[in-house]
């Protein structure tokens, strides 16, 4: 419990008549008050005595404490001062007390002031008028104290408003003796150095800053008092960790995804992990918040309180009525226009700046009202400023006395009560507070950071040989006189370093114990390993008899530890034996495999029963079991089979490479022949085979056992040529249409090349291929001309047949005379144009003239000639039948040969049908021409006998039948020709 901080809040009040009591270390330091009243005290009236009612004062958070205080009397001087104050009530009523928050709560108490139990002053009762007394007995002006828990913030003194009342020094009444009593009634408050103070914002400063958000979402802060704004968060609004981080170069930020990272504003570096420097300051801040508001960041309050208590106990015993303030009352600072005097030179206290509360002749002191109903009059000290400063400095100087002096003063001021009745904690706190007075260092320390100071303090603990089981009080007695004790300025830091040192010491001791125990284990294990007689089957009882005299066996005291190490050693021996057996077996297997590899008589198809006798002769075979030998032998045979398969696979791959090379060479030969024109799309395999069968390239590919044959490659090349020729033919057709070049039966190859030379590059196309395309196009042009000629012949015959139906047309008729007759006929007007119809008309008239002349000549021919003519006609009929049969045979022959000369654009069947139709059409044309000649001959023969009636009758009848038959044949031929025209139009592909 001595190592823990006491709660720095309100402590229970103890009666001053008890023995001397030291304040706990966590108590706030007392405050030095100097009261200089500015109002002339009245002399006629007496001051009212103190009420027996309990003294009440506002503590932390506004809680009113009821403290039992015995009735006492004031000094006679107080009566005179109060008399003057009653004489001038008008002036006193004008005095207004303005109470301002005084910062953090501070205890204004002096419980360690010793008051004799029998001491008392006469204090007659005087009725005090309600005139607004500015002291404790005046109007109930209750001081309000903020609930902040630190000393930071601005200290605002109470302001006195109203007219200033000037008086002379002789009008002031002193109510406290100016000797030792002055130090009793003026407790010292030692202000820490400015370097050690870390001011926290006051409640008023916190309300001055207002947080706002800009249009872009950024936060800024505005001060209502100074009318200034800033992007940076003010120190007054920072949290505990933010204030701690402000002492470092690192700053915490958050990424868009919420992760926290840390940025160093000096080195411009960022990291995802918290730097060690930030961790240290945050831990210190957290420890300070746990230990109390005065544990970190300011000088340790317990140290200041201890010094103040020491100074108070060192002073002689004063009047009991002059101990006025209680625990829990906050620090009250009263300032004046006078300058604060400097501290006494040569003072050994580390706290240099001491607050001295002074009041000038123009100011009045303000104290808290200790009751809500009845106020208690507390005397006000009146003395000169020089005397007060001197006494205050003496009090501060006395705080550095030795332990003996402090103890002596405490004993003198203690009241009745045995020493044994004091509690242990109070006694320990007293010892600690007394030993704390020795922290007056003659030398100052300077460290780069706090870690160095902690290391120095830990080195002090180490040099003092502080044990891991020591308490803080034990360590204090050993290290308090060392100058390194002041390396850490606050008691919280020293205790934290002390606890860390104890933890490190315990850890080091534990590590040392483990190392010593480990060495004993290793020695015992080494003893077992050195013994050759130990085997995996050795028993523990036998082991004990073997090593019972060995020092290493005795050093290990616990029987359980010995047996555990022995069992572990036996397990290791078993494991080593098993591993050794496995290694031996593995080595024997490897040697046996090498032996099998050296035997040339073992083949992939060898049998174990045939080679077993030959293998067992070798010693390497006898090292293994029979089953192991058989398994290894079978595995070796499988390896041989795999090797043989791999060899075959490699040979097969090499053969495939050779055959692929032969095919590539034959491909090159085909490409070469295509380039020279020896191989075209119409080349036949039998013809090509006769050319290449004697070449070595063909012989090489013919020897291939797999892959494509030479014929397959040839057919692929021909098929590719057909596709390329078809593309070339389409391209040339487009060029001819673009150039408007028409091929005719009389066109030559040179003319054809010239017409397409500008659009097609001939160096890339052999003339052989180009000649094939030209021949196909020329044949197509001839077929087209023949078709046009046949079409015109049919139209001529059709028109002539129509002209024969007109009776008005004779051999002497002319076109101009009968033009209206021909043009007026619908059938005639649809056939050709006018010039064509005129030409046909003139041809028909010429035919009539020839017939007329032939008839005239036939009249002169004798009868026997006509009979010969009839015989010739029969002979002509038989000849006609023979021609028909011959045409039919030619048709079949051409149909059989058509499959080799079919068009590349049409299927073979369609090409054969076309060739059949062509031969049929040619046969029909020959037949028609023969028939027409026969008809003409028949007509001429009848015309020759036109003089007889029978001949004339017969001629007229034949003429009508011939006309009807011709008309029917004409219609059939027109339908047939129309179908043929549709098949052979220019837009169709036609023959290749």
UniProtKB/Swiss-Prot annotation:
The record's PROSITE patterns line, in alphabetical order, gives: FF, WW_DOMAIN_1, WW_DOMAIN_2
User: FF domain: from which residue to which, for each copy?
Assistant: 450-504, 517-572, 585-639, 642-720, 724-780, 782-847
| Keywords carried by this UniProt record | Coiled coil, mRNA processing, mRNA splicing, Nucleus, Repeat
The UniProt entry's coiled-coil ranges are 958-986
One Gene Ontology term of the biological-process aspect is:
RNA splicing
What are the subcellular locations of this protein?
Nucleus
What role is this protein assigned? Answer: Binds the phosphorylated C-terminal domain (CTD) of the largest subunit of RNA polymerase II and functions as a scaffold for RNA processing machineries. May be involved in pre-mRNA splicing.
Name by which UniProt lists this protein: Pre-mRNA-processing protein 40B
């Amino acid at each position: 419990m001595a190592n823990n901080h006491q709660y720095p809040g309100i402590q229970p009040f103890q009666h001053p008549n008890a023995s001397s009591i030291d304040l706990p270390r966590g108590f706030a330091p007392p405050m030095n008050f100097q009261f200089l009243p500015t109002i002339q005290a009245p002399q006629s009236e007496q001051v009212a005595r103190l009420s027996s009612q309990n003294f009440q004062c506002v503590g932390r958070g506004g809680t009113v404490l009821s403290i039992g205080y015995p009735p006492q009397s004031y000094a006679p001087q107080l009566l005179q001062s109060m008399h003057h104050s009653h004489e001038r009530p008008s002036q006193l009523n004008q005095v207004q007390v303005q109470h301002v928050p005084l910062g953090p709560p501070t205890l204004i108490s002096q419980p360690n002031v010793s008051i004799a139990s029998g001491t008392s002053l006469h204090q007659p009762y005087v009725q005090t008028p309600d005139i607004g007394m500015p002291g404790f007995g005046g109007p109930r002006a209750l001081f309000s104290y903020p609930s902040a828990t630190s000393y930071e913030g601005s200290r605002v003194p109470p302001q006195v408003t109203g007219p200033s009342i000037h008086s002379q020094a002789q009008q002031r009444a002193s109510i406290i003796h100016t000797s030792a009593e002055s130090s009793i009634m003026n407790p010292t408050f030692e202000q820490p150095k400015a370097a050690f103070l870390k001011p926290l914002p006051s409640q008023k400063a916190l309300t001055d800053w207002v947080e706002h958000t800009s249009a872009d979402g950024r936060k800024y802060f505005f001060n209502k008092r100074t009318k200034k704004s800033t992007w940076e968060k003010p120190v007054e609004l920072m949290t505990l960790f933010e204030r701690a981080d402000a002492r470092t170069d690192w700053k915490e930020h958050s990424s868009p995804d919420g992760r926290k990272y840390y940025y160093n504003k000096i080195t411009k570096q960022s990291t995802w992990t918290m730097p060690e420097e930030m961790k240290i300051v945050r831990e210190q801040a957290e420890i300070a918040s746990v230990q109390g508001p005065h544990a970190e960041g300011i000088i340790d309050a317990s140290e200041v309180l201890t010094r103040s208590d020491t100074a108070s106990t060192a002073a002689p015993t004063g009047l009991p009525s002059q101990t006025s303030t209680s625990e829990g009352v906050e620090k009250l600072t009263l300032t004046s226009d006078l300058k604060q005097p400097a501290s006494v030179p040569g003072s050994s206290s580390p706290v240099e700046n001491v607050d001295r509360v002074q009041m000038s002749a123009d100011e009045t002191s303000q104290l808290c009202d200790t009751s809500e109903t009845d106020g208690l009059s507390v005397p006000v000290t009146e003395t000169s400023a020089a005397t007060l400063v001197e006494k205050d400095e003496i009090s501060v100087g006395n705080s550095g006395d030795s332990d003996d002096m402090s103890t002596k003063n405490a004993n003198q001021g203690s009241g009745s009560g045995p020493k044994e009745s004091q509690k242990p904690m109070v006694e320990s706190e007293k010892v600690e507070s007394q030993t704390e007075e020795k922290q007056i260092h003659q030398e100052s320390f300077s460290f780069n950071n706090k870690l160095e100071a902690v290391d120095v303090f830990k080195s002090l603990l180490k040099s003092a040989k502080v044990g891991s089981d020591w308490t803080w009080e034990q360590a204090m007695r050993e290290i308090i006189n060392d100058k390194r004790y002041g390396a850490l300025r606050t008691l919280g830091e020293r205790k934290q370093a002390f606890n860390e040192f104890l933890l490190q010491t315990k850890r080091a001791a534990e590590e040392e114990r483990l190392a010593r125990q480990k060495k004993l284990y290793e020695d015992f294990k080494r003893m077992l390993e050195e013994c050759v007689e130990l085997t995996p089957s050795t028993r523990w009882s036998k082991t004990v008899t073997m090593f019972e005299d060995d020092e290493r066996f005795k050093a290990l005291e616990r029987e359980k530890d010995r047996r555990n190490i022995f069992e572990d050693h036996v397990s290791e021996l078993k494991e080593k034996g098993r591993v050794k057996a496995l290694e031996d077996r593995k080595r024997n297997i490897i040697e046996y495999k090498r032996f099998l590899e050296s035997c040339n008589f073992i083949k992939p198809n060898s049998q174990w029963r045939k080679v077993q006798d030959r293998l067992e002769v070798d010693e390497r075979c006898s090292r293994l079991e029979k089953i192991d030998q058989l398994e290894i032998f079978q595995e070796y045979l499988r390896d041989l089979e795999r090797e043989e398969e791999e060899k075959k696979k490699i040979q097969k791959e090499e053969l495939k490479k050779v055959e692929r090379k032969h095919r590539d060479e034959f491909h090159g030969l085909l490409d070469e022949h295509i380039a020279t024109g020896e191989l075209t799309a119409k080349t036949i395999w039998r013809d090509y085979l006769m050319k290449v069968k004697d070449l070595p390239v063909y012989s090489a590919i013919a020897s291939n056992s797999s892959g494509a044959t030479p014929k397959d490659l040839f057919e692929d090349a021909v098929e590719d040529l057909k596709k390329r020729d078809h593309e070339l033919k389409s391209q040339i057709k487009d060029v001819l249409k673009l150039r408007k070049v028409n091929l005719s039966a009389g066109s030559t190859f040179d003319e054809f090349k010239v017409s397409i030379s500008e659009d097609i590059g001939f160096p890339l196309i052999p003339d052989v291929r180009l000649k094939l395309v030209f021949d196909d196009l020329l044949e197509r042009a001839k077929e087209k001309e023949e078709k046009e000629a046949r079409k015109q012949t049919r139209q001529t015959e059709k028109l002539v047949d129509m002209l024969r139906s007109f009776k008005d047309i004779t051999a002497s008729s002319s076109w101009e005379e009968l033009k209206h007759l021909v043009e007026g006929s619908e059938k005639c007007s649809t056939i050709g144009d006018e010039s064509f119809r005129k030409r046909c008309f003139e041809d028909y008239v010429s035919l009539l003239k020839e017939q007329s002349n032939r008839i005239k000549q036939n009249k002169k021919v004798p009868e026997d000639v006509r009979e010969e003519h009839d015989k010739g006609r029969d002979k002509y009929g038989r000849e006609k039948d023979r021609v028909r049969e011959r045409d039919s045979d030619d048709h079949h022959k051409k149909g059989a040969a058509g499959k080799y000369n079919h068009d590349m654009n049409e299927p073979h069947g369609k090409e054969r049908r076309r060739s059949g139709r062509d031969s049929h059409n040619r046969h029909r044309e020959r037949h028609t021409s023969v028939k027409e000649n026969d008809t003409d001959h028949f007509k001429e023969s009848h015309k020759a006998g036109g003089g007889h009636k029978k001949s004339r009758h017969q001629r007229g009848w034949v003429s009508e039948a011939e006309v009807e038959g011709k008309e029917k044949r004409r219609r059939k031929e027109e339908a047939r020709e129309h179908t043929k025209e549709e098949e052979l139009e220019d837009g169709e592909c036609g023959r290749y």
